[in-house]
A protein has these predicted regions:
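Structural recognition of the conserved hydrophobic beta-strand(s) that form the central parallel beta-sheet
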Residues: 36-38, 65-66, 198, 222-227
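Conserved RecA-like helicase ATPase core segment
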Residues: 210-305
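Accessory N-terminal region flanking or inserted into the helicase ATPase core
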Residues: 2-5, 102-201, 212, 237-239, ...
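Glycine-rich P-loop/Walker A and Walker A-like loops and their local beta1-loop-alpha1 context
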Residues: 1-51
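Structural preference for long, well-ordered alpha-helical segments in enzyme cores
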Residues: 5, 16-21, 49-50, 99, ...
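Short glycine-/polar-rich loops that comprise or flank the Walker A/P-loop
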Residues: 30-33, 58-63, 193-194, 220-223, ...
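Conserved P-loop NTPase-based nucleic-acid remodeling module centered on helicase motor cores
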Residues: 31-140, 148
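Catalytic acidic motif of RecA-like/P-loop NTPases
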Residues: 42, 203-204
């Protein structure tokens, strides 16, 4: 079963996830894994919060607080696949510097001498990899481009990308390579078979992450996905410039995955605002991007300082 937990900011989505995990751990300390999947920067705070809430119950062994990168590492550690040392961002930039010194560039030759160029190229290559764009794909695209300037830029990027691949082949893998390996290993990962998974804190996924979620849908017994959006039926969300378009896009794509896999879905909507104790703050949060403007009597909850 796939459950979408939706609500505005401060409506208690993360708390609902933690309370559900806590209840299951108290009722049954052992059993199938309970996984809460978060953006990497949230994992420490949420794991600490969960540990504090369970300190009177002796901690936990079946609950896992993971980011996407840590999930990939766990899958590869348990199911095999880690063959080469991991290359971090600094290491990748050093390799790129070596590639740039030995690669003949055309239109990007001057830019390549600028400070932070390697960091920019590293980010571009990361986006290529997360989107499933290989060197071969770029080479095929080059044959279809008529604009000379664009073609030269893409040709330079392709040469750099190919050079980095050559330097890393059989020696290192980066986070994107690790994620790709994990996606391939997930179907045979018995560790997550029939696990219960909560996915919280994301407002968007890159293409690799969508593929991870699709694999998890096929493996897990239940998945609960939180989205910071208050109404899935509002057609305004379909506009690319809409405030909650990214969250709505996540809902649509993952809902379609569930339909394809014949997985039942449900939607839980949280409406109470737990974050804003002052009525004026809650009103601004609710009405900030709404038109026409709505007026409200001032109750003393805000001060404007100039």
């Amino acid at each position: 079963m796939l459950e979408f937990i939706i609500g505005r900011a401060g409506s208690g989505k993360t708390t609902a996830c933690l309370n559900a995990i806590k209840e299951k751990l108290i009722h049954s300390p052992t059993g199938k894994p309970l996984v809460i999947l978060l953006p990497d920067h949230m994992t420490f705070a949420i794991e600490r919060q969960l540990a504090l809430e369970l300190k009177d119950y002796g901690g936990f062994t079946r609950a896992y607080v993971l980011g996407m990168s840590r999930l990939a590492y766990q899958v590869l550690m348990r199911c095999g696949g880690i063959l080469h040392p991991h290359l971090n961002e600094i290491g990748k930039e050093l390799l790129l510097s070596r590639v740039l010194s030995s690669t003949k560039l055309s239109i990007l030759a001057k830019a390549a001498r600028q400070h932070h160029f390697t960091a920019s190229v590293s980010q571009i290559i990361e986006e290529f990899k997360t989107s499933g764009i290989s060197v071969t794909t770029l080479q095929d695209i080059l044959t279809l481009i008529d604009n000379d300037s664009l073609k030269q830029k893409l040709s330079d990027l392709t040469s750099i990308y190919a050079g980095l691949d050559e330097q890393m082949a059989g020696r290192y893998h980066d986070s994107e390579d690790m994620m790709e390996l994990a996606i391939k290993k997930l179907p045979e990962c018995t560790w997550l078979q029939d696990a219960e998974i909560w996915i919280d804190g994301f407002d968007a996924f890159n293409p690799q992450h969508f593929r991870v979620v699709e694999q998890l849908l096929a493996l897990a017994s239940d998945i609960h996905l939180t989205l910071c959006i208050n109404n899935l039926n509002d057609i305004e969300h379909e506009a690319p410039t809409a405030l909650f378009h990214r969250q709505f896009n996540v809902f649509q794509q993952i809902n379609n995955m569930a339909k394809k896999l014949a997985i039942p879905t449900k939607i839980t909507t949280l409406t109470k605002n737990h974050r804003h104790k002052q009525q004026d703050l809650a009103f601004i949060e609710e009405q900030l991007f709404k038109f026409p403007l709505t007026k409200k009597n001032y109750t003393g909850g805000l001060q404007i300082v100039e």
